[in-house]
Design a protein with these regions (language model features):
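Histidine/acidic residue-rich metal-binding segments in metalloenzymes
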Residues: 28-31, 153-166, 182-198, 218-365, ...
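Hydrophobic faces of well-ordered beta-strands that scaffold small-molecule active sites
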Residues: 40-42, 174-175, 199-205, 257-259, ...
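Histidine-centered divalent metal-coordination motifs
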Residues: 43-47, 317, 445
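An N-terminal structural lobe/cap that precedes and organizes the functional/catalytic core
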Residues: 10-99
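Short acidic/histidine-rich active-site segments
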Residues: 49, 315-319, 367-371, 397-400, ...
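Single conserved hydrophobic/aromatic residue that forms the stacking wall/gate
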Residues: 1-12, 444-445
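Active-site-proximal loop/turn and secondary-structure-junction residues that shape catalytic pockets
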Residues: 179, 205-207, 261-263, 320-324, ...
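Alpha-helical scaffold segments that flank or form the walls of functional sites
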Residues: 60-191, 239-255
């Protein structure tokens, strides 16, 4: 009723202070407490190079729809790409080489079909907050919006990358980084005294854990090079190399790790067994699923102990099936919009992994996210089994993630947490974003 009683343009106008705040309690909590608090975006996919270089985008399509990297891989907001594909837009306008103006037109024409999808509000709010546009984007308004946004992007000092971050009152950004990354751009950011917010790397060792996926042996060669070795000849060499890289990340300000797993495994094995499995795969043979789980469990326990030692938070993102469209995944590569919710049941394995770390008092602070909302209650009950006096809320139920990152999904996640744990100790939301415009909600009510 709140939105039906107003034109959508009016909903986004700056004077509408109560957008999304539909009760006196919500208004009180936001305006009197939350509105002026800084944002700590502890998990995102924003490229640190663009922060250091203070990139100025040429047009709104570059910001929203991305493009192709020099190495041929693709970058951009796959949420928007999925909207376009669902509206029948040919791929050449999405990740292809069509002119940016034409790509933007196709997105604008698709957006009105997205009522009920958070993309609709996200897009129009970004136009309102950062560009002062109080209309709504569609095929008819695309030219007007294109010209307005591009003029501001090219000339407004507040619309460089750093300008967007600063005006959004962002205090902390946690990027997502591979263990082999030299963190060059993080070093440059740390050395630049004009950057007032903190940008910290996060340790994402998926490629060193996924022994059963293509490219593992090649990646281990790169990990060896990162620690000054010709090769990693044994499992001790692997754990030593990972420890070396974790310590380097910690020196660079790393506060968190992140693990993107199909499911969380737990299968015990001796060091000798795991070494044999590693040697087998490095020799070009294929390991069984059970062998992969033994290796993964061994590495995860080792990493968990290092995180605890160094005060790094361990994050698990699981229950996602990635690249399920084989043809398009082969053509475009990962993280291009062909992933789905999985239904793996691994609550017992999560508990066993935490218990193994807890046995030696080396369980780190942990945040657990599942892409399947059906796991929320199970996660909520796992938390209470491993809390202790080290810190309130040591084990966290991660915020609604990815396909659950909308009003219904966030309410359901917080309701589960509140009913099974302590909502007051929740670490809160993050952007998980690849876009510098994703801090919109911090400015809606200013």
């Amino acid at each position: 009723d709140y939105y039906a009683s107003r034109g959508l343009g009016d909903v986004y106008k700056r004077q509408d202070k109560e957008f999304m705040l539909q009760s006196p309690t919500a208004q009180h909590l936001y305006h009197d407490y939350a509105a002026d608090m800084p944002i700590c975006d502890y998990h995102c996919h924003i490229p640190p190079r663009e922060i250091y270089e203070n990139r100025r985008f040429e047009n709104i399509a570059q910001v929203w729809l991305g493009g192709r990297n020099p190495d041929g891989s693709y970058f951009g907001d796959h949420y928007k790409w999925r909207v376009m594909r669902s509206n029948g837009v040919p791929e050449e306008y999405i990740t292809g080489d069509k002119p940016d103006r034409e790509r933007f037109q196709k997105f604008a024409e698709a957006l009105p079909m997205a009522i009920g999808n958070p993309m609709y509000h996200w897009t129009n709010l970004e136009l309102h907050v950062f560009f002062g546009y109080d209309g709504v984007l569609n095929g008819d308004t695309a030219e007007e919006v294109w010209n307005l946004c591009n003029d501001k992007l090219q000339h407004d000092p507040k619309l460089t990358v750093r300008g967007l971050i600063e005006q959004s009152n962002v205090a902390f950004i946690g990027t997502t980084d591979d263990p082999i990354d030299d963190l060059y751009w993080h070093k440059k950011i740390k050395e630049d005294s004009t950057i007032k917010f903190t940008v910290a790397p996060s340790f994402r060792p998926d490629k060193a854990i996924n022994i059963n996926k293509p490219g593992f042996a090649e990646y281990m060669g790169k990990l060896a090079a990162a620690v000054g070795k010709e090769k990693l000849a044994c499992i001790n060499c692997v754990t030593s190399a990972l420890t070396d890289r974790i310590e380097f990340f910690a020196e660079m300000g790393c506060r968190a790790s992140d693990h993107g797993l199909d499911y969380i495994p737990y299968r015990e094995a001796t060091k000798e067994e795991v070494n044999a499995i590693y040697q087998k795969v490095m020799a070009g043979e294929t390991c069984t699923p059970e062998e992969a789980e033994k290796y993964q469990t061994y590495i995860l326990i080792h990493l968990g102990k290092q995180y605890h030692r160094l005060g790094i938070v361990m994050q698990f993102h699981y229950n996602c099936l990635r690249g399920v469209n084989r043809k398009m995944n082969t053509l475009l590569g990962p993280d291009t919009g062909y992933d789905m919710i999985n239904t793996a049941t691994c609550g017992g394995e999560i508990a066993a992994l935490l218990s193994a770390l807890n046995d030696t008092d080396e369980c780190p602070k942990t945040i657990i996210y599942s892409l399947n909302p059906g796991d929320d209650a199970q996660i909520g009950t796992i938390l209470g089994c491993f809390q202790n006096s080290e810190i309130p809320g040591k084990i966290q139920h991660g915020s609604a993630w990815w396909f659950n990152d909308h009003k219904i999904g966030m309410e359901e996640q917080m309701s589960r947490l509140a009913s099974l744990g302590l909502l007051g100790n929740f670490v809160g939301m993050l952007t998980d974003s690849r876009s510098f415009l994703s801090y919109t909600l911090s400015l809606i009510h200013i």
